[in-house]
Each structure stands twice: as C-alpha cells, then as structure tokens.
Amino acid sequence: MKESDAVILIHLGINIVFAFFFFGISAVVVSCIIKCYNTHDDDHDHDNNNDGHVSITIKERVGIKPYVLRSIPIVDFNTKDFKYVLECVVCLSELADGDKARVLPSCDHWFHVECIDSWLQSNSTCPICRKRVCLKQSRTRPELGGRDKSFNQNHDQTSEHHEFSTDPPTNTDTAIIEDGGCGEANEGQPELTAVVIDIPAKEI
C-alpha cells in the first residue's frame, strides 16, 4: 500500500468520525428543543385550567336556639297515657314508664330527653316528620289593654240604649305572633350555613 493511500484512508476515517459526532450532537439538540416546546405547552394548558382559585363550599348544619330547647318541657313518660307503644326513633328504643322525655310542640312527637337534645344540637327539624322545631306564642299588644278598658266603659254607659256586638274589633284586638326561634325560614327546611373557602391553585 502506498503512503498516499494510507493518508487518504486516515482522512476518510476522521471525516466519518466527525460526521457521526455531528449527527449525534444535532439529534441531542433537536430532542432538547422538542422537549422544551412540549413542556411549555403543558404548562400553558395547566395555567389555563387552574387560573384563579378553587372554591369549596361547606354546608354546616345548625341546631335550634338554646332558649327554644329549654322551653320544651321535660315530662315523666307514662305508658298508660297511650294505646300503643312509643319508640324513640333516635335511639330506636321504646319509651318506658318513668323515662324522661320531651314532646316537640310543633308536631307532638315524643323522644328521650338525651336523644332529642343531642339531635337538636345539629338539626332544627323533627327526626320523624322533619317539621321545623320552634315555639310560637301569641300575646296582645300592650296598648290593647287600654283600648279594651275604654271600650268596656263605653259599652257599659251606652248598653241601655244600644246593643253592641260581643266580638272585639278586628283591627284592635289582633294578636301578635311572637317568633319562637324560627326566624323567616320555611318549616321543614334545616338551617344551613354555606362557607366558601378560596384556595390558590397549586403550581406544578
């Protein structure tokens, strides 16, 4: 083999090595560019999907007001007062003679004191009929007392000549209904408190 041929082969080998090296570097660079582009697109889509905050709504059950619960009388249960056996639906046990019980004024359902008190701490309705538990008492306005007195005096003075109706005037003797802890909520609807919590979106 001539010396010139050996030199040509050496140069050819060097060129082949450089060619492989160049193509390898090019492949790595192109791969990195493609990976960075895909990562940018994924981050952009993630930001669009998680823009702002995540809202969580928590509904909290609220029981009846304490003074309403205290207004419900506690009685000693007597089976002789009932034709059928009564069962406390909270504990699923029968009411027995001497048991301390409460009867809900809005629906006349009976329960053990401990059971219904625990129930009404987180609920405002009857466990059986779901009717709202509250007390409603009626009373006459204070100023009606004076009107009634003057009306009776006038009636006594003129009773010899005129005959008056025994029914009181509608516009003066209308009783006021006091709210017994019911508020303006509808009967049968539990009190729910909605709490909205804003949580910043977690960046990935």
From Swiss-Prot:
Residues 142-174 are annotated as: Disordered. It is found in: Membrane. Its EC number is 2.3.2.27. Disulfide bonds: none annotated. It is a single-pass membrane protein. GO terms for biological process: cellular response to water deprivation; protein ubiquitination. GO terms for cellular component: membrane. A zinc finger (RING-type) spans 88-130. The RING-type zinc finger domain mediates binding to an E2 ubiquitin-conjugating enzyme. PANTHER family: RING-H2 FINGER PROTEIN ATL16. It comes from the Eukaryota. It comes from Arabidopsis thaliana. Its main location: membrane. GO terms for molecular function: ubiquitin protein ligase activity; zinc ion binding. It catalyses: S-ubiquitinyl-[E2 ubiquitin-conjugating enzyme]-L-cysteine + [acceptor protein]-L-lysine = [E2 ubiquitin-conjugating enzyme]-L-cysteine + N(6)-ubiquitinyl-[acceptor protein]-L-lysine. It holds the Pfam family zf-RING_2. The chain crosses the membrane at residues 14-34. Pathway: Protein modification; protein ubiquitination. Belongs to the RING-type zinc finger family. ATL subfamily. PROSITE patterns: ZF_RING_2. This is Putative RING-H2 finger protein ATL61. Keywords: Membrane, Metal-binding, Transferase, Transmembrane, Transmembrane helix, Ubl conjugation pathway, Zinc, Zinc-finger. InterPro entries: ATL1/ATL16-like, Znf_RING, Znf_RING/FYVE/PHD.
